[in-house]
Amino acid sequence: MDVLHCRKQENLEKALHMALKAVRKGAELIVLPEVFSTGFCYEHFDHAAETLPSPLLENLACFSEANDCIIMGSVIEKVASEEISDIGTPADSENSTLSNSINSPFYYNLGFCFESGTLAGSYRKTHPFKTENNYFSKGDSIEPISLKKQNLKIGFEICYDLRFPEVARKLSLAGSDLLVTTAAFPNPRSEHWNILAKARSIENQIPHIACNRIGSAPDCSYFGNSMIIDAWGEVKADAGNKECIIVHDLDLSRKNEVRKMIPVFENRRIELYSEDLKII
């Protein structure tokens, strides 16, 4: 999807239009790119942000209910400082580079997952990249999203999270059936994107839907290359460098076959390296 900079309503309409086309092609799970509604609209950040409950997210919930599907992506979330304390994430407040005023809002890159009209779960990006740290607080939880109707678990990553193998590994160890990454990887990092997306699938023996935006922003451009990858690491569908819809019927049971063939999880020797991973 080519995200129009700071143009929330137009992006929502485009996302719903493309999502409907995807459903008509047989899609049951739809993934939108990172901050699909506005892009990184720092110059109008407060306007770009969604305060829950959000009319924009309600539109997506209604779409998922009307079409009996799952829809995922991310938006900018605005949270009052009082709410931060209420939900028990003071560490985020302390680490934030935003104002420390008691009335100052906090912002997150919020990943959402609607299943047939219900918010199945959400995820706040845990690894903001460079400039993002000047605007976003860090999420403090990495857990799969459980879908009740589909009876499966989805591991959710947002963009820069993809560069940290620990994230996908933790999600896989927690029982994820599928990995989903929503991203805004810019040029000239297409080769990194291609390799990392496949690597997370191969090393965890898990299917991976990796959705990356395309188009231009004021300070960079994006290459797309959204992919659907199976548990063997084989790319089953690739959007290339254009705005389009890709659909593929993923066999989620393939994960179990691959793990029997190459028992990586059984053969791990965590006693040799688990503590070393904490060393800087």
PLM feature segments, named:
Residues P144, R213-I280:
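C-terminal beta-strand edge segments of enzyme domains
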Residues C6-K8, L12, L16-S116, P186-I206:
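Cys-nucleophile CN-hydrolase/nitrilase-fold catalytic domain and related Cys-dependent amidase chemistry
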Residues T38, F45, F112, Y123-F129, ...:
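Short beta->alpha transition motifs characteristic of CBS
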Residues A49, C62, S81, D86-G88, ...:
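Active-site catalytic loop in hydrolytic enzyme cores
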Residues L110, S122-R124, T181, D238, ...:
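Residue-level detector of high-confidence beta-strand sites
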Residues M1-H5:
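Generic N-terminal amphipathic, Lys/Arg-enriched alpha-helix
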Residues P53-M72, R163-I245:
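CN hydrolase (nitrilase-like) catalytic-core segments centered on the catalytic cysteine
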